[in-house]
């Protein structure tokens, strides 16, 4: 979707530039061809103003092919590339839009808004290293702009900047710039996962002072638990015992987010964050009351008087929290009813794929495989799911077919999970346990623990959390997991890279 206000401002600025440029060309008595390039550009600008994107890009690309384009001043060329990016974005040619934004930001006229457009267009085509470069530029040159920028885009760029394993230095440069720019998430929450990685980089460079400085911003008990469990962080954990007191951290985070929610009465996003903190703390009855109050307010509000600004993006997670609280209280049937309602809530403006998969997952926990498969009906496999999401969907199908004793379909799905195991290694690990392949599951868990890039999640999985009510099939799955973790080879690897602790918090599954 094009940002209409920014587009209109760009088009108005281009109109002023065009008028001045034409007058200058006439005064200079240049050849008619000089005026022609301006006329072609203006044709493209007017088409863009009328939302005729194909017509606009045709005119702009015609101008770009004209020899006279190269004689234009750099500021004029900058505006033409910017118009081209808007036109391609309007016709959903995101690769073209990204290429034009890369050209536009090569000019000194480019400001923070233009670099943010480059990051947005890069994210559309999964060019995450370039998105990271754009955000780094903003954070360094316009740090004040970071506070008002799209925090979800910035977070995604920061987390995915080194997905190919070739841009570690550039990612650390980005994290350093974001830390200096005081980047925060909605409601002032810290991006704990980013600071976790920045602390690790400081320790790898034997800079304990810097590690302590960055660790001081980490708020979430879950991130602190992962760091306590990882031997790479021992120096900073020892130096900052107060920060890494998990019992205190759980209470501290609940208190902080309660105040944040009060200070942001129209934000569901901060209430979703608060909900996660309440789950960690085991305050399930409070979370249930909170979610019921929110759902009631939304349900009874008039269409033109929505009580929150982000209902479309966040309400489905409020339903998810309510269901999680009910399960944690052992109210299984009530939780299923809530999850069925959650499936009907839109997710980011489209079909709620996440809740459909979650519903299917819990149906197989309940021993209702037919319902699980039915919950997955209607999901657009090709367009609605990421590679990770497809693994979750297939795992639900695998468990359902196992319960139905449909060996052929179960084997077919297991073959898919095996072939695509790198898309979600944690899910493949669970599938191997379900299949009785403890040796394979152990080998994978050991490999994940020894891999510095995968250790965070693997160590988090092996911690001992406070007990929760479990259905029979959940208890069976937990028994298989404990058998895996108790193996001598797995236990030795855990001790080699970290430790297994009894965490004073809950790990409530979505």
Predicted features by range, described:
Residues 8-17:
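Bacterial N-terminal signal peptides
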Residues 29-31, 65-72, 102-110, 137-146, ...:
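Solenoid-like repeat scaffolds
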Residues 358-365, 377-415:
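Alpha-helical adaptor scaffolds
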């Amino acid at each position: 979707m094009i940002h209409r206000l920014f587009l209109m401002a760009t088009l108005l600025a281009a109109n002023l530039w065009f008028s001045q440029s034409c007058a200058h060309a006439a005064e200079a008595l240049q050849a008619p061809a000089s005026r022609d390039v301006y006329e072609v550009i203006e044709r493209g600008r007017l088409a863009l103003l009328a939302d005729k994107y194909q017509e606009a890009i045709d005119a702009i690309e015609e101008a770009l092919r004209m020899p006279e384009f190269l004689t234009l001043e750099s500021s004029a060329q900058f505006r033409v590339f910017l118009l081209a990016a808007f036109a391609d974005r309007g016709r959903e040619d995101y690769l073209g839009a990204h290429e034009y934004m890369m050209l536009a930001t090569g000019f000194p006229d480019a400001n923070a808004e233009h670099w943010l457009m480059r990051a947005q267009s890069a994210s559309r085509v999964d060019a995450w290293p370039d998105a990271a470069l754009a955000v780094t530029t903003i954070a360094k040159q316009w740090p004040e702009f970071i506070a008002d920028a799209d925090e979800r885009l910035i977070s995604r760029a920061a987390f995915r900047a080194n997905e190919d394993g070739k841009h570690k230095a550039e990612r650390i440069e980005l994290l350093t710039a974001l830390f200096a720019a005081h980047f925060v998430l909605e409601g002032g929450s810290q991006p704990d996962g980013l600071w976790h990685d920045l602390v690790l980089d400081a320790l790898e460079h034997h800079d304990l002072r810097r590690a302590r400085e960055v660790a001081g911003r980490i708020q979430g008990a879950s991130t602190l638990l992962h760091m306590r469990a990882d031997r790479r962080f021992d120096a900073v954990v020892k130096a900052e015992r107060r920060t890494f007191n998990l019992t205190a951290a759980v209470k501290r985070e609940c208190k902080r987010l309660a105040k944040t929610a009060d200070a942001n009465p129209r934000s569901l996003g901060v209430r979703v964050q608060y909900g996660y903190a309440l789950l960690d703390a085991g305050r399930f009855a409070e979370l249930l009351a909170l979610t019921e109050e929110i759902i009631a307010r939304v349900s009874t509000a008039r269409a033109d008087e929505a009580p929150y600004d982000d209902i479309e993006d966040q309400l489905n997670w409020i339903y998810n929290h309510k269901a999680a609280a009910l399960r944690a209280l052992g109210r299984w049937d009530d939780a299923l009813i809530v999850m069925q309602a959650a499936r009907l809530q839109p997710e980011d403006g489209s079909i709620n794929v996440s809740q459909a998969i979650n519903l299917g997952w819990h149906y197989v926990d309940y021993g209702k495989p037919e319902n699980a498969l039915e919950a997955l009906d209607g999901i657009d496999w090709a367009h609605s799911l990421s590679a990770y999401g497809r693994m979750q969907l297939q795992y639900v199908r695998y468990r359902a077919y196992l319960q139905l004793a449909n060996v052929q379909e179960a084997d077919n799905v297991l073959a898919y999970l095996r072939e695509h195991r790198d898309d979600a290694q944690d899910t493949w690990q669970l599938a191997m346990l379900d299949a009785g392949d403890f040796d394979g599951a152990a080998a994978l868990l050991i490999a994940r623990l020894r891999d510095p890039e995968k250790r965070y999640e693997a160590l988090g999985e092996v911690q001992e959390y406070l007990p929760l009510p479990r259905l029979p099939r959940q208890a069976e799955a937990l028994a298989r997991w404990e058998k895996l973790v108790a193996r001598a080879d797995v236990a030795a690897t855990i001790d080699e890279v970290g430790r297994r602790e009894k965490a004073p918090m809950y790990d409530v599954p979505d």
